[in-house]
UniProtKB/Swiss-Prot annotation:
[4Fe-4S] cluster 2 binds at C388, C417, C420, C423. InterPro entries: 4Fe4S_Fe-S-bd, 4Fe4S_Fe_S_CS, Ion_transpt_RnfC/RsxC, Nuo51_FMN-bd, Nuo51_FMN-bd_sf, RnfC_N, Soluble_ligand-bd. It comes from Edwardsiella ictaluri (strain 93-146). GO terms for biological process: electron transport chain. The complex is composed of six subunits: RnfA, RnfB, RnfC, RnfD, RnfE and RnfG. The gene is rnfC. Binds 2 [4Fe-4S] clusters per subunit. Residues 536-558, 571-631, 647-706 are annotated as: Disordered. Part of a membrane-bound complex that couples electron transfer with translocation of ions across the membrane. One of its GO terms (cellular component) is plasma membrane. This is Ion-translocating oxidoreductase complex subunit C.
């Protein structure tokens, strides 16, 4: 019946599996009051004293700081650190800190000025008027972390369970041997601890607040009960002494009977736990405005001459604490343990600083701790499994840790190990199981970090590929839209350009240009005619009249001029060597119609070509008529006829008489220009008859040439004057449109060049048959040419 009523009581307690009862050894330091020690000559303040990354530096070397001034900036799970006293920053470097690995970390070296001047503080005495988020942020800026040993940021823990907490547990068990820091703190500052509990209750608003304390601390229990008289919501629970009842999951099981699920936090079941020293630091931060810059540290062990609990500033070297505690070293390198005998670690050097999670400095003698025994093989006794409070299999975890079987160790819940050291305490083979577990955890964390970085790199790579694909798709879409928006004319231009590029590769550029551009077509035609002339250097059948009369393209005079110029140039190149007579098509190639400069160039080239002997021109070359609607060309033809007649009169031997048809072919009377030509021819014949007596005297070729030139020039002027008189009548009668002056100048130049070439060469041409009698102009011109050639033939023997 008694057990039934006890089970129904609210103060019911539960038990956890396993656990041990080692010697407590707390009486060495528990009966000595708290004391303060003087500041050291140098404080070494690590930037990372909690679970999380280090903060951003706010100070620099040589800067003077005040007590409580932030040295780093904290955001999220990054806690700031503060100056433990006023002084000057002497260095910021990496130094060995209080960690089992002994690896150096970034630290701030502060030289105290021994004035201990406080900086600006922000107390909140009326904290009930503040909102929970504001209080949590204030706690975060004070740099408060869990002081029980884990070092988890208190503000992060409060934020994580703000709306789900039903039970708030204050851990005052302090179950590990030798450590009495919390015991002395509760004895001397019980009221402040209760105030801290009230602040947490205001922030979390839990249904109940439980303080769990072991029954081996009667004085602390009495002090707390006295302080809780005015706080009915806060309950004090005294639990049996058993190691490790101070573990978070173990104390939750003892006070509530609930177990925290694997891989989850206590907040998932509505329970939040805080250490009693952390609660005291919260009270000092909120009500007094003091950041976490000092804590209570137990100095104990049989080698300590003045053991006890001291207020140690954060960053105080362990060597300074040992000097204050009166260490009596039994050898040159005494054993110094930071923490308790079960969960602590041996320091590699005594210059490491005190940090926020440092609760004890233990210096045992040889009699306290037996000489370490050599490690022996596991005998599979199972004692470790019996005492494990987490209900794990330490033996299997040991094998997996030895064999580097990380997956199996993870599968056997190695992460649930609280590293209490109970398994190593009972191991008969002296196997340091906790050390193996710590090493295996570190390796697993390293593998997890590497896998996480690889996953992040893969995610970045995949995101980059996705971005490139999106950009490519966007470009293709823009190109498609641009292709759709191209007009028909632009599309034709693009297609023509592509066709030219493709045919240029195949050597067909000229054909494509001729097809797509009329100007290029004319140029191609001229090139073709020039090539035909070059091919005509070898004997070939004469071209038909239809070929000779093929007109050049009339749609663009510039194209025609270009084609004619190219044809003449190639014809002159072919004329440098003896070649057969040109065809009719060569004779009717039109001269440039719109450029006097090209005409001048053609005249110069014709003069150069005339320096070498050339075959006599055919009838088609000689009788190519000028256009019938141009009086200037008619005058030029008449002048040429008169010049040839005079040259015949000046010959050494008499030339054969011309027929009546040659001399008396009248031009049609209905055309004044033709009449002028006929008159000029008649005057030339009369002059020849009058000067017949002078033919017996020899005349040089040079004199004949000069006279012919003067006569050609005079006849040209007279014919131009005569033709000009009837131009207006002809234009009015026939409605013809006169062509440009350039054509007349070109025709005149051609006539002069041909006459000079004939006289200078002095060749004896063959008689040339007259053209069809139906064209009076052609007949007259042919007769004049025949007479000039006969005169040259008669003058040649006389010179010899």
């Amino acid at each position: 019946m008694f057990k039934l009523f006890a089970a129904l009581r609210k103060e019911r307690l539960w038990d956890f599996t396993g656990g041990i009862h080692p010697p407590e050894m707390k009486q060495i330091s528990s009966e000595i009051p708290l004391r303060r020690i003087p500041l050291p000559n140098l404080l070494i303040i690590p930037l990372q004293q909690h679970l999380g990354p280090e903060g951003e530096l706010l100070v620099k070397v040589g800067e003077r700081v005040l007590k409580g001034q932030p040295l780093t900036r904290g955001n999220g799970r990054t806690l700031p650190v503060h100056a433990s006293t006023s002084g000057t920053i002497s260095a910021i470097s990496r130094q060995v800190t209080a960690h089992p690995s002994g690896l150096p970390e970034l630290c701030i070296s502060l030289v105290p000025d021994q004035q201990d001047c406080w900086g600006e503080r922000h107390p909140l005495p009326d904290y009930r008027a503040m909102t929970p988020p504001a209080l949590i942020d204030h706690i975060h800026q004070a740099g408060i972390a869990g002081l029980g040993g884990a070092g988890f940021p208190t503000a992060a823990k409060l934020n994580g369970g703000a709306d789900r907490i039903n039970t708030l547990i204050i851990n005052a068990a302090e179950c590990e041997p030798y450590i009495t820091a919390d015991d002395r703190l509760m004895r001397e500052h019980a009221a402040e601890i209760v105030s801290g509990c009230a602040i947490l209750s205001h922030i979390l608003a839990p249904e109940r607040v439980l303080i769990g304390i072991e029954d081996n601390k009667p004085q602390a229990i009495a002090a707390l009960r006295h302080a809780l008289q005015c706080h009915e919501k806060i309950q004090l629970r005294v639990i049996p002494t058993k190691y490790p009842s101070g573990g978070a999951k173990q104390l939750i099981k003892i006070l509530t009977g609930m177990e925290v699920p694997h891989g989850r936090h206590s907040a998932s079941i509505g329970v939040l736990m805080q250490n009693v020293a952390t609660v005291y630091a919260i009270k000092r931060a909120v009500i007094d405005g003091e950041p976490l810059i000092e804590r209570v540290v137990t100095l104990t062990g049989e080698q300590m001459h003045r053991p006890g609990n001291v207020w140690a500033a954060i960053g105080t070297p362990v060597k300074h604490l040992l000097q204050n505690g009166g260490l009596i070293a039994q050898n040159k390198h005494p054993m110094v343990i930071m923490g308790g005998p079960l969960m602590g670690f041996t320091l590699s050097r005594l210059g490491v600083p005190v940090v926020k999670i440092t609760n004890c400095i233990l210096t045992p003698s040889r009699d306290e701790f037996s000489v370490p025994q050599a490690e022996q093989p596991c005998i599979r006794c199972g004692a470790c499994a019996d005492v494990c409070p987490a209900r794990l299999l330490p033996q299997q975890l040991y094998w997996f840790s030895q064999g580097k079987e990380h997956d199996k160790a993870r599968g056997y819940h190695l992460q649930e190990c609280i590293e209490c050291g109970a398994c190593a305490y009972v191991c008969p083979s002296n196997i340091p199981l906790v050390q193996y577990y710590r090493q295996e955890k570190a390796e697993i964390r390293a593998l997890d970090d590497e896998a996480r970085r690889a996953a992040e790199a893969k995610a970045r790579f995949e995101a980059r590929l996705a971005r490139l694909e999106r950009e490519k798709a966007a470009r293709e879409q823009r190109h498609k839209q641009a292709a759709v928006s191209v007009s028909n004319s632009d599309r034709e231009t693009i297609q023509a350009a592509l066709q030219r590029i493709n045919l240029r590769k195949a050597g067909q550029t000229d054909d494509v240009a001729a097809v797509n551009d009329p100007r290029q077509a004319a140029l191609a035609a001229a090139i073709a005619r020039a090539k035909a002339k070059q091919a005509g250097a070898t004997p070939a059948p004469a071209a038909t009249d239809s070929d000779a009369a093929a007109p050049a393209p009339q749609d663009d005079p510039r194209k025609a001029a270009i084609a004619a110029a190219i044809t003449r140039a190639k014809a002159k190149q072919a004329g440098a060597t003896p070649a057969p007579a040109a065809t009719n098509s060569d004779a009717v190639a039109p001269a440039p119609q719109d450029d006097p400069r090209k005409a001048a160039i053609a005249r110069a080239k014709a003069k150069q070509a005339g320096a070498t002997p050339a075959p006599a021109a055919t009838n088609s070359d000689a009788v190519a008529p000028a256009p019938q609607d141009d009086p200037r060309k008619a005058a030029i033809a008449a002048a040429i006829a008169r010049a040839k007649a005079k040259a015949k009169q000046a010959g050494a031997t008499p030339a054969p008489a011309t027929t009546d048809s040659d001399a008396a072919d009248p031009a049609p009377q209905d055309d004044p220009r033709k009449a002028a030509i006929a008159a000029a021819i008649a005057r030339a014949k009369a002059k020849q008859a009058a000067s017949g007596h002078a033919t017996t005297e020899p005349v040089t070729v040079q004199e004949n040439t000069d006279g012919a030139r003067r006569q050609i020039h005079r006849a040209t002027l007279q014919a131009a004057y005569a033709s000009g008189a009837g131009a207006d009548l002809t234009a009015a009668a026939e409605g013809a449109t006169p062509e440009s002056d350039r054509q007349a100048a070109i025709a005149t130049a051609i006539a002069r060049v041909k006459a000079r070439q004939t006289l200078v060469n002095g060749e004896v041409p063959k008689p040339v048959a007259t053209s069809t009698p139906t064209d009076t102009q052609k007949a007259a011109v042919a007769a004049a040419i025949a007479r000039i050639k006969a005169k040259q033939a008669s003058a040649a023997p006389s010179e010899e």
